[in-house]
Amino acid sequence: RQRQMCIRDRALLQKCAVPLLAAAMPRAVWLLADTPALTEAGILPGEDVHKHLAGCGQAILLAVTLGPGVDAQIRRAGVGDIAAGVASDALGSALAEQAADAAEAQLRQWAATEGKYLTGRFSPGYGDWDIAVQPLVAAALDTVRKAGLCVTDTNLMTPRKSVTALLGVSDHPVKGQLAGCGHCVLRTRCEYRKRGKTCASE
């Protein structure tokens, strides 16, 4: 029975993936800036983001979106089929992370040619880097014009399947602060963890 469920789940994911991939139009925009300038602009509040940028004189702001077509396809998939809607939403989140990974890989290639080193990605909502900075990040990157990415009054991104992040830039090897539940100030009262999930999986 468990094997049958796995086969059925795999078939559902494959069925949902085809139209989702067809609807995706990934776009990425990034900006290299001095960290003091970002701090002065109010983009780097909190301690955790500064720990992540320790030893970095510059940082890269990055935004990646799959475009509105993916959001629309997720809605269509869920009409009359809750399982397909949930599967499509999960696939969309995974696809957005893959697009962010691809953009990061390009940035690492650029850094290598410049003799620079990058930290990993650190996104608004990690640790005490409040998602309230999303409008400032979007404005600095001009995401509305360059990528069609907007931020709502409640600091949510539209299209939903989008990622914003920051990477530290240094002249010497750096790791940055590891992201994840173990480093999150909300880990002891996180509603996602109570349900056996993480915010990254939503």
Language model regions located:
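Active-site bordering "gate/hinge" segments
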Residues: 8-17
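A glycine-rich, hydrophobic loop/mini-helix early in the fold
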Residues: 19-84
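Short, small-residue-biased leader/transition segments that mark boundaries at the very start
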Residues: 2-7
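Short terminal or interdomain "cap/linker" segment that borders an active site or interface and mediates
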Residues: 114-192, 202
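Structural signal for hydrophobic packing residues in well-ordered secondary-structure cores
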Residues: 17-24, 107, 111, 185-188
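Conserved mixed alpha/beta catalytic, RNA-binding, or beta-rich assembly cores of soluble enzyme
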Residues: 56-123
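Flexible, glycine/charged-enriched surface loops at secondary-structure junctions
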Residues: 8, 26-32, 107-122, 195
